[in-house]
């Protein structure tokens, strides 16, 4: 009888081999898992990259499509026949207006159905088709680019808190400028006309322009700033045209404030015999300004601020009530006002303890607000020159001596000067 084969290995050895086989299989499975995970991550990365490329290409396609549409519209406009430019004289009914076309004359024309009749008023610039003379487009007002530049786009950051020693002036300008713009019903209830213009006059450096900037900051309206010298032009009639367009722009962007600095350059008193064509042109500009201030169409949404340091040479026709309703004087600050101004300009400075600003204010008798600000700046420059990060009393004293230009001997010590 044949012997049956028996496994002669020990049970421990068989179990070890079985465990080794299972461990090898587990390692192989773990390796395959890591391989496929890396492969999945790589595919996901490629998918994200392809998605980003697709989004970028779609954005480029949309941009190119928009450019194509814009160019097609521009090409269509270029292929259209030209139009006549006219000015509306009178609205006649629901679909007809009387238009003046220079130099041909006046015509009664039809209005295109796409035009809103409520937007058409006298003096509106319009476009007429050259074949049928149908009004098909309302044009914006023609304003000189130089006049457009006078409109201040960014609201000034000056506030009333930055102005010292002018409490009475601030109160008066609020009554004339801010109150009519923010609460016009108060004037209507009293039955009085709103003030049109304000004249700020006083020595240079007393805060006239600074207060005008603060008014623009606190009133939510368009601020137009123009210097009187900008309205003096070389050719006859140019200055008058700029004044007209200035008020046209103010009416379009109402409520608005027109600030005319150095008004004495065009508003000086008229003489019987001028010295030349230059004076005559300046007088024409002033006459146009007077006409605009009177205004055949009085607007309560336009306020005029004027500033000058030579009120004595201004024409009396400009100063009469109805054109300039309030005149606000800006004198040099007194001792208390000088102290307030010094506190305002030095509150951001790194000062040493014990600085006596009241003593500085006492020594600057007759100084203007601009000179007080210059003293604070010069004191900081003296500290900077000594490589210090703080300002001392001596820095202020030297700054006062420099700004005020004391008539003293050069070798005189500062201690003797301030005794």
Swiss-Prot record:
Modified residue annotations for N-acetylalanine: 2
Residue location of crosslink Glycyl lysine isopeptide (Lys-Gly) (interchain with G-Cter in ubiquitin): 406
UniProt xrefs under PROSITE patterns: AAA (PS00674)
Binding site for ATP: 202-209
Superkingdom classification of source: Eukaryota
Keywords, alphabetical: Acetylation, ATP-binding, Cytoplasm, Isopeptide bond, Nucleotide-binding, Nucleus, Proteasome, Ubl conjugation
Molecular function terms from GO: ATP binding; ATP hydrolysis activity
Subcellular location: Cytoplasm; Nucleus
A GO cellular-component term linked to this record: nucleus
Primary residence: cytoplasm
Cross-referenced InterPro entries: 26S_Proteasome_ATPase, AAA+_ATPase, AAA_lid_3, ATPase_AAA_core, ATPase_AAA_CS, NA-bd_OB-fold, P-loop_NTPase, Prot_ATP_ID_OB_2nd
Family from the record: Belongs to the AAA ATPase family.
Function, as annotated: The 26S proteasome is involved in the ATP-dependent degradation of ubiquitinated proteins. The regulatory (or ATPase) complex confers ATP dependency and substrate specificity to the 26S complex.
Quaternary data: Component of the 19S regulatory particle (RP/PA700) base subcomplex of the 26S proteasome. The 26S proteasome is composed of a core protease (CP), known as the 20S proteasome, capped at one or both ends by the 19S regulatory particle (RP/PA700). The RP/PA700 complex is composed of at least 17 different subunits in two subcomplexes, the base and the lid, which form the portions proximal and distal to the 20S proteolytic core, respectively.
Protein name stated in the entry: 26S proteasome regulatory subunit 8 homolog A
Source organism of this protein record: Arabidopsis thaliana
